[in-house]
Every structure is written in C-alpha cells, then in structure tokens.
C-alpha cells in the first residue's frame, strides 16, 4: 500500500498522475495486476518522483518507509507518497495505518508557522496577554530575558527542559550539551520518563547496562510468546504481524496474553489471563516459586551467571511527601498521606511475612530516599521470600475477571508455568506500559529477568525477557544519549566523577563544568514549577501538559505562577496553549535525523522537504539560543549548594575567551567546522541548518539565515559516537547508516549484534567473558553489599560478569477502588492515534476512523447504573473529572470493575483524572491504575 499526499493545486493532470502512481504502487504491494493504461500512467508519474529511505515517525518498532517527493517549477519539494520499505528488515515493506500517513501529519491546516508570544496591547510580553506573531529575534530576545531572570535568581536548578523520546539522536545530544554542559543544569528530562524509565532501571540494576539482550529475530525463532501488559496488536502492530505470522506458521507456537482487560491481542492468544491491576507482581513470583518447587532451575546457568539480591520495601509511591501541601484538594490528601506511612493490608501481611511485617501494622515509608538501594542475599533467603506465592494465594489475589471461576484461573496460571518451565520450549516475554507505568515498575521489570534467568532462557535466540519501547527513539535518544536528569551518554551518570571527566574531555569543557547533582525528573519539574522552584521551562518534541497525570495542578502552575514556558511545537496542542512563547518547529522529514528502536537498531534519514512558513528545526533553535550566552554569563559563578565552582578562568586557559558564546564552544568549535558543507552526502539534498533554504528565515540576530556552513548533524553524530566506542555501545559512522537499513549496536568491525551477553554472537561477551558462554559484562569488575533479607551488611559480594536475580514482593498500589470510587481506571493508546493526538488528529483518515476517545466499560457495570451505549458519562476521581462517551462493545472489553479510556483526545482530558504516583526508583508515573466513579453526565 502507498499513501498518497495530494498537492494543493487542484489540477486534474496532477491529481490523475498521483492517483495512477499510488494505485499502481498499492496494487503491486499486495500482488494485484492493474490495467496497462494505468500502469503506463503510473510509470510516467513516478519518473518525476524521488524515492528515498526514511523511518516511521511513530512507535518504537522502527519501521522503515520510503518517501516520495516531487519538486515544482521553483525547486520546492512536497511529499507525494509514502510506502513501506521492502528492504527494511523490521517491517519488510509493511506499515501500520499510522505509518502510511507519516507525511500527512505535516500538512494539517493549523500548522504553526511563526513564533507566537503572549503580549499586551503595547506589544510587550504579558503572561495574561494573547498570542501574537513575532519575529524569531523578538522570540529569542524574550526567551533570553526570561531565562536570565530565572537563572540569576535561582541558578542552574531554576531552569528546565522537557525533552523527548521523539528527539532525533542529534537533537537529544545537542540538548544535553546545551543544558548540562552549557547551562550546568541537570534539569532536563524526557517524556520517556513516562514510558521507559522503569525498563531502564530494571536493565541497569539487573545487568549493569541498558537495553534488551535480544532482537526481533526472536519472534521467528521462539515457540512461546507471552505478552504482559502489552497490547501489541494495537501498540506495535507491525511486530504483531510478525507474531501472527509465526503463530499461524506452526501449531506448536503458543501465544499467551496477560492483561487487566480483553483487547485485540487477546484475539490471537491461546490463553488469556485477566488479572487484577498490580498483581502481576504476585504472578511473576508464583512462576519463580513453581520453577524452584519443580526443580526446573537451570543450576549451571544460575551458578555461573547470577547472584541473588533484594532491597527495601517501605519506599513510598513517588508522590509528594507532604499531604498538607497547600495545592492539594482535601479529597487528595488521604491517598498522598500513604507516601509518609500506610497500614499493612492482609495481603501484604502474607507477602511480607519473610520480613516479619504483619497485617494491621503501620509501615513508615522512611526508605523512600534509598528506594534503589539493594544488596546480595543467599538462594535460601530468596526461596524464603517466595514461599507465600502458592497457587491458591495468587489465584485469589490476582483473578481479575469476577465472572471467571477460580478453578479456571488456577488452570491458566498452571498452564502459564508449564509453558515457561518446559525445557523443550523457547519463550519470549514481551511487555510495554503495563509493566513500566507501575508503582513498582522497576520491581516488576526485574521479576521478568528473575524468571528467565532461573530457567536459563535469557540472551538466547528465541528466548528472553524483552521490553518493547513505546517511542521512536526512547532507546536511541533518551536512553543512549542520556537526556534523563541523571544520565550522560552511553549509560554514564552525572553523579559519577569519572563519567563527568570523560564527558568534559569529549566536549572540550573545563574540568568541573558538569554538575554532579542529579536534576529534577519529569514530574518533579512540574512540582517545582508549582512550588516556584523552577521559573523557566522549554518544551521540545512532546506535550507535557497533556501527558502528565494530575494535570489540573500543572496547568494552574503554568498559567498562575511567576514563570515563563516556551513550547517548540508544530501544532497548537494543550502545552502550546498554556505556554508563554510558542516556537514553530520543523517536523521529521523537514530535517536530517536518526532514531534508535527497541532492538537497538539505529537508523538515519535525510531531509526531504523544507518546513513551511518560518518553522525551524530543533537543533537550529538550540544553536541560535546558545548564541545568546557568553561564557562569562554562565561559567563565571559558583553554586555552593550544587558543589559547582566557577570555571571561566579554566576555560580561558584552554584557549576560550569570556566573549565566546555557548554556540562557539558547543556547536561551532574547530572540530565541528571540519565537517564540510561540501560533503558528498549533501549533494542535491536539502539541509536547512547547514545550507539554509529558499525561505531565508530570519535568524536569532534578525538576519537572513544562510546556513551554518558546516555539517552540524554529522559533527554531532561523530562526536556523540565517541562515547560508546570500546564501551559496548559502539555505533557505526554517519556515512554507513545512510547506506544501510539500520544496524543493531554494538556495531564492532562493521558487524551488528543480535544477542548481547552471548559469546556466540556478542564481541564483548567474547572479549570480557574469560571463555564463558555468557558474560553479563555491564557488571564487569563490580561488587555490591551482601546482606540479609532485611538489610545490607558491611561485607561485599562479587557480581563480576554476572546478572542479579531480584526478590521483589507483592504490595498493594496506593489507591484502590472503594465505596466512593468503586472502579479501576486504566489509560493507554489506540491503534489509529499517537500519544496526545497532536499530529494524528490532524490526519483526516485517522480522525474519521477514531474521532474521539471513548470510555470502554463492561455492559453489566453500565446496566447497574442504567447507562447505555454511546451515552455521555462523567469519569471522576479525587483529582478531577472528564466527560466521555460510553462504549460497551468495542475493541477493548474490560472486566466488571474496570474502565479503559485512551489519552489521545484533548477533549477527553483523562490525565486530569489520573494519579501522579510513580515507581519510587525509576520515577515513572503509573497511568494504569487509580480509583474512579462513572455516572451519567
């Protein structure tokens, strides 16, 4: 199939031209013949088209696409067609419905094309004023003024950037350089905090290194596919097509879907297990107990490659630790109070008995600050912690469908264990937001590895625990580049002095420039805005005021506090509407870039067309803003509370002057200018940042922008890849990626890696494993504290080349249904729309398919309240309420007691309802469970 993008001029010949070509391409893709006349017309049409490889804009699958452009008489190009790339190994020519409309997202009627500033009648900035068009110079003038006001008052902690898992890799790298290296602030955090942070911490705590061991090839090699909180049929549809193909190709292949509600993934499943929200923790522990009791542990694998570990349990829920905070409504405070202490429930009295904790006791959450601390324990202690998770206990705790018999549910749990334990079966566990957006997201991620490591079914072709990424570059940018508030590139962290030293050397910064104090994670940035501790924020490539739970608080903070909010956007979404300054931004095919997908595959693309109006790429925006800061303004002051000293004199000793700008140092230094604008890759190509373009957009100084004159994207890439070379994060050079359909890192001697940690396939496992079959080299040369089930000791245990198997108990979520709010709420996505809908709701075909978010509900729950199909209802929690239309027979079929509401529709602003509890370790918000009531509107 090919999606055609028609031009604005309604000439019949052009229309017929494109229709013929698109029809021919679509027919060919499904093996149909077409009339010879139409075929000839199509061939003539496509002679004027230029096809180039690119990457889909949407999920973390990383599908390759082909983009067709056609130039008009003035040399301006427009995208005229999109199709799947048959040479792309991920999708093999197939796209999902969103992928076919990748180009149409760029041509919405309300595309932002000029900077917009809130002003009063005199044209002066006024936070309560209305938006008015301004020049880029005027926009940067106000942006600079407000930044320096906040920075001079509060220092590096007073400013923040909301980054993205949809940044290109070079954009994310530029943002980290500017914020952490230039402004000396660690207050940059991506929306990937909402989607992948729990997976990241699960990887880091288990393996000492981030990202999956396996790859998509596991789908074709496995016998058993288990999805945990992953509606792959809608959220990763192209991968699901591969799962479907594998399932239908062999009667031996089994699919099991674990979910809190029935969805399209259930349709293919041999077994569907509907569990109560949060009880996946107990099901994983049941599996581990079964493995041990059935003598199914791969003892040789575990002895050679694993150590056992545990941590504190009284760690809170990532909420504010002050329930009397003046911004809370009275009805919010009882739930927030559990951040300080809670009463142990009857179920917790059973699951925590190994710690001597009893039901009815008060548990003080005094280890919240040490939530990530963990230590080694014995195998005997590990077994003791699993004793409560019998079939009877877990079945009664976890059964999520009231209409299902307990015996049926028990049988499903037994079958699940049978499939995992069968020594003759390969097995892959896939999960996404159901496990990541979880108040114990780190724990439940670690539990997946617990089961696979006990069985010796990890890092092997066809077997492994596999976290599926949600966003197109949550892996490649947010994680690998390190746009989180605690990270640096290649899994390094700001708190490690050696890591800061390495970074300062690559960036040519004075020693001591980087800030050692971890910055504010995504949700804390919002809370700090509410408290007045952050007074300037820049939003890039995401929509935080729609995508953050408990949204009423943050909208009030943006509009009522003394702060300045900048939003770089392509369309007027909710975040743009609450901003003080909107910067019009180039979209994916209007710039050069790269993404990294869920199987560690890095893919690059070229700019295909020029952005409309005055919209400019994010790299350009950061580079122009960097010109506004002399080194004397950002490096000549120390901050005792942050242990930051002045580094201006050290900078002078390196050859810099106090008049040099951050642009000169970070983006236009001598190394950067060695990357020529005459590069062969640029021949006959658009590159707005390097060469300028026909629009002659005004730059930050009020002059026509003619390009930087050096290949800034290539410079950023080649500098960035220095971090990973030789450190098991090796990436290929820039030119190589433009020749291939992506490579899975580490890329060593031109060879990609399919299965990490396995010496048959991984260069580093061979190099560092001392002849072993497996080497979990993220923990090479490391040790950790030993201890008991309750606490660490002074002793150490080696974890050299080993992975950790964690004991993590079941605990209740902080908010559960009760008499006043009797139903669970789960949020998520639908196939047709992407995240907040800012792009996909502008595509007519996608909008017509799903024009609004619905409230999916069980018919019996509706009947109990005399509610009917398509009736408008209120969905209300302790935090807020929204109206939505009921769907009692749609694609999502919740059990009694649970509703599902997608979050793509700003008119059904469901994040006003959601609870802002997080995993205390990963700081990732739990969007999958809170208590609500539903009633007639």
Curated annotation (Swiss-Prot):
Residues 1-42 form the signal peptide. Substrate binds at residue 903. Residues 49-110 form the 4Fe-4S Mo/W bis-MGD-type domain. It is an enzyme of class 1 (oxidoreductase). Gene3D superfamilies: 2.40.40.20, 3.30.200.210, 3.40.50.740, Dimethylsulfoxide Reductase, domain 2 (3.40.228.10). Catalytic subunit of the periplasmic nitrate reductase complex NapAB. Receives electrons from NapB and catalyzes the reduction of nitrate to nitrite. GO terms for cellular component: membrane; nitrate reductase complex; periplasmic space. Keywords: 4Fe-4S, Electron transport, Iron, Iron-sulfur, Metal-binding, Molybdenum, Nitrate assimilation, Oxidoreductase, Periplasm, Signal, Transport. It catalyses: 2 Fe(II)-[cytochrome] + nitrate + 2 H(+) = 2 Fe(III)-[cytochrome] + nitrite + H2O. HAMAP family: Nitrate_reduct_NapA (MF_01630). Mo-bis(molybdopterin guanine dinucleotide) binds at residues 98, 166, 191, 195, 228-235, 433, 437, 543, 568-569, 591, 618, 827-836, 911, 928. Predicted to be exported by the Tat system. The position of the signal peptide cleavage has not been experimentally proven. Its cofactor is [4Fe-4S] cluster; Mo-bis(molybdopterin guanine dinucleotide). This is Periplasmic nitrate reductase. The lineage of its organism: Bacteria, Pseudomonadati, Campylobacterota, Epsilonproteobacteria, Campylobacterales. It holds the Pfam family TAT_signal. SUPFAM superfamilies: ADC-like, Formate dehydrogenase/DMSO reductase, domains 1-3. Binds 1 [4Fe-4S] cluster. Binds 1 molybdenum-bis(molybdopterin guanine dinucleotide) (Mo-bis-MGD) cofactor per subunit.
